[in-house]
Amino acid sequence: MTTVIRYGTRLEHLHEAVKLSPHGQTALSVWINDDIRPLPPSRRTWSTMTFIGWWSVWQLSLTNWQLGGSLVASSLSVWQTMVAVVLGRTIAAIVAILIGYIGAEWHIGFPVYSRAIWGVFGAFFPTLLRIGLTVVGFAFQSYTGGLCVTAILSGIFPTFFRMSNTLPASAHVTTQQIIGWAIFNIISIPVLYRRPERSEKLMIGMNIMSFAALLGIMIWSLSHAHGAGDLIHQPSQLQTSDSLGFGIMQGITTVVGTLSIALTSQMDFSRFARKPSDQVFGQWFTFIIIGSIMPLFGCLTSSATQAIYGEALWNPPTILAMWLQRDYSSTSRAAAVFAGIGLVSSQLALNVVDNGYSVGMDLSGLLPKYINIRRGCYVGLILGMALCPWELLASATTFVSVISSFSIFMAPFCGIHISDYWFIRQRRLKLSDLYHARPKGIYFYTMGFNWRGVLPWLVGWVPLLPGFMHSINPAIKVSVGADHLYALGFPYGLLSSMAIHTLVNKCFPPPGIGEIDRDDTYGTFTVEEAAKLGVNKDSTEEDSDRSLRRESREVLETKV
């Protein structure tokens, strides 16, 4: 009995140790902590320039650089590729701004708003799905970052460059690569420690280094090739107008699809905006202008490297490795090191913003009593390392096809969010009912689940399954129509889910449409915001704190 009591005491101490310490105005419960509560004005510090810097992280990434190459490889010409890029970026900007208004006006993120759509318990499903996708993204972006670190170390240390591979071929990774990967993950730790609202200057610095490195690589390639080479003038391989039109539409889908997870994360970051309009121009400018430059840089550089090396190099780390392999002089080594530092900055910023903070916020929404954004980032980092991305790439030739198809599951989420906020709820939410699971809450629905969110999501991706299976295994034969529908997966998923969600909710209206809180329970709004919404701003911070603690006690007492 004494032993049982002792172990019970230890478990109790462990439980208390892993729980978050309450601070600020939020009383911790299984539904709320400081990172997922509606943000108060003191934490909403992002301006238009912040959003330009924040989204530039993705637009200046290696993924965006390589986007042009993937479209040219699909038989489009370079200039047709740029048309698809600009149109795709325009669509993505519109979706981002519409979804961003949810966070900018009500200051909540994806996990919390999902409770309004799916129910307070049903929201666990989209949150878990997005956690899985972002962890996989974490793993692959870390691996790419490790390749950039390998280029830096190879340029600095001749012994590292000539290091023998001590791992067997069955490991699917070299000694150099695994060292670079480990170092990249280590240097990610202090960057992940910073809160999103305090990362503005750091991200701006990383963006500058990223742009300088990528611009330098392009200028070097154009200079050594004495121009852009022949690939830039290569005509499209699509001869008929029908095939060309479909090819461009497929390119637009690819452009938008690469941002699918980031688009669902939009409200996670727009909630930091000082005012809703701050996110509009910042994202419009970044998506269309900056977002269209990098694919063009990638196309020009690849065309030039084909003239230099006899093959088109689409991946910047590969270009750095080629510099060192062809000429291990002090000049080449210095160039590889400085360019590598810029590329590491790019990957580090992208992994933190696109994967780290996203999985941190989702885990915080899943287990708010134990995980905040910072802890969630570290959990994501550990899970990403455990996946060993080189094994995933080597063990299944279809894995990359599966990863690239994630957008078909994310597009319906985007459509449902736009429909729910703009057409059904008409931009009005009852914040207090998003943070408890008592049956009297309007977002409790039926036992905490809302069937109205399930049907539109299924309609948004189930018809794409035949084409999805064919992309994984070409031996599976499908009709031309099914293949074409899958190629247009993102716009289909977005528009069909939006239409079905609107129709279902108009025919079967959910409870509480148009309701908002009478009082500013969480100290969320400025005086101007409260007046516009008709919310009472007279209560003090102490009243707000007592209300939050009362909410938490009621949840625990009902054991819901």
Language-model features: locations:
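Membrane-interface loop-to-helix entry segments
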Residues: F140-G146, I179-H224, H233, Q283-F287, ...
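Membrane-water interface regions at transmembrane-helix termini and the short interhelical loops
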Residues: A73-S75, Y101-I102, I117, F125, ...
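Membrane-embedded translocation segments of transport machinery
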Residues: V57, G68-I91, V95-G100, A213-L387
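Juxtamembrane transmembrane-helix boundary signature
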Residues: V85-W118, L128-L133, G137-Y143, T305, ...
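Membrane-interface "cap" regions at the ends of multi-pass membrane proteins
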Residues: T2-V78, I208, L214-I217, H224-A228, ...
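C-terminal membrane-solvent junction of multi-pass transporters and transport-like membrane proteins
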Residues: T175, C414-A499
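Hydrophobic alpha-helical segments and their helix-loop junctions in multi-pass secondary transporters
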Residues: G146-G155, I208-S236, T258, C299-A307, ...
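Loop-to-transmembrane helix boundary motifs in multi-pass membrane proteins
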Residues: S170-W181, S364-A396, G441-P463
